[in-house]
Amino acid sequence: MPAKQTSGKGAKKAGKAKGRPAGASKTRRRKRKESYGIYIYKVLKQVHPDTGISSKAMSIMNSFVNDVFERIAGEASRLAHYNKKSTISSREVQTAVRLLLPGELAKHAVSEGTKAVTKYTTSK
């Protein structure tokens, strides 16, 4: 019996099979968009149980929450940097809230934040 031809025109390459890998589907999965939507909806239902929210209003609220988050995080980061700290603690966040939010709103935000941190630490 003659030896198999491994090079030249008629040689077949062994190795990777063409096509999709096992378990892959035809359609690509869309990347999930993260949003505060479910949390905004939960708070809305706590405050006004009989009120709904449109998708446009939800989008505006989501943008608002992202904006406030970025402002607080940026200010807290700056405060940590000024004090030569590499970690943002609740103290930096609290100070950032006091600097960014006006008067009574800052007081309420600080008290709610303190309450949330206390609840979290006691549940651990």
From Swiss-Prot:
> Cross-link Glycyl lysine isopeptide (Lys-Gly) (interchain with G-Cter in ubiquitin) maps to which residues of the chain?
119
Q: Where in the cell is it found?
A: Nucleus; Chromosome
Major location, coarse class? nucleus
Region described as Disordered: spans on this chain = 1-32
Q: How is it modified after translation?
A: Monoubiquitination of Lys-119 gives a specific tag for epigenetic transcriptional activation and is also prerequisite for histone H3 'Lys-4' and 'Lys-79' methylation.
Question: Could you tell me which Pfam families the record lists for this protein?
Answer: Histone
Q: At which residues is glycosylation annotated? A: 111
> GO cellular-component terms in the record?
nucleosome; nucleus
Specify the protein name: Late histone H2B.2.1
